[in-house]
Amino acid sequence: MTDRTTPAKKQADRFARAREKQSRALLEDYAELIGDLIAELGEARVADIAERMGVAQPTATKAISRLKREGLATARPYRGVFLTDDGADLADRVRA
């Protein structure tokens, strides 16, 4: 059997893998930062997360939504963002 994958398909696959790795690394950064803010300030507010990450609040909100979808964080209205046990474990692994 011959490999019929075109060069364009191979390149697209390579780019997709790179984007996924970058996306995962960014998620790890957010989890670590949320843990740091909670340890430092007792809470992690979206405004503080956005400021520390150097992004706009909607960008931080989108990343937090992904953390929540993946079961790594929870958010409470007017109370901030909190890491789940899995999120805290991820933040600890990133720090190590």
Question: Which residues does each predicted region cover?
Answer:
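Long, low-complexity, charged/polar intrinsically disordered regions in eukaryotic proteins
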Residues: 1-17
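N-terminal helix-turn-helix DNA-binding core of bacterial DNA-binding proteins
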Residues: 13-55
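Key DNA-contact positions within bacterial/archaeal DNA-binding proteins
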Residues: 58
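Short, hydrophobic-biased segments on the C-terminal half of alpha helices
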Residues: 64-65
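A short, conserved structural fragment
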Residues: 68-78
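Basic, amphipathic "hinge/linker" alpha-helix immediately C-terminal to the N-terminal HTH DNA-binding motif
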Residues: 79-95
